[in-house]
């Protein structure tokens, strides 16, 4: 039950879940818990002094997060992505703050890849600081799985962000269809074009729409009630336990 519950947060989940063979009668729509987490921490996020601490100004930097295995551990993808990042730094001529995971930092050091001096490799940032940086960046370039959800939430509270996903596929197609982020790929041409577009559209107010499943702030309540309501059913039908 748990895997079906957690995995059923997508708007177009029915098609995907049916393909996996999960039974419809034990699959429930919950939505993503990210909106609740962001809302619960929003005051702290907005009060963060991270820009002052690391010497950045609103709309005068690009925020980078690149840590996924396919981008870091695959040589071809790694070289393509960071060559594109260097090109981005050269084009925009502003700091690119890289919240760098230890594994990514080790990979960069081991490879000897030379980053543009404007790419500032920073220790991993905490939740509130990172989201404050997202809210104030000219653009966010990230392979994080939560970027579409965060973008949708910020759009719903009237604070859109220019979100660019450095991947070639996404588990969040409903947010892509809603126009909440741009799926850029990892080549120089793709990244530059996507970033240009994301920034221009944000500045002109050409925005997507919040994805309902990513702005629902009742997810935790629904999860608890579904679990409580179906404990006996699952015990009987799945685990074949006597009542």
Model-derived segments and their meaning:
Residues 1-7, 12:
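Single conserved hydrophobic/aromatic residue that forms the stacking wall/gate
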Residues 45-136, 241:
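Donor-nucleotide binding loops and adjacent catalytic segments primarily
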Residues 130-175:
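A donor-sugar binding/catalytic signature common to diverse glycosyltransferases
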Residues 200-243:
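C-terminal amphipathic helix plus adjacent low-complexity
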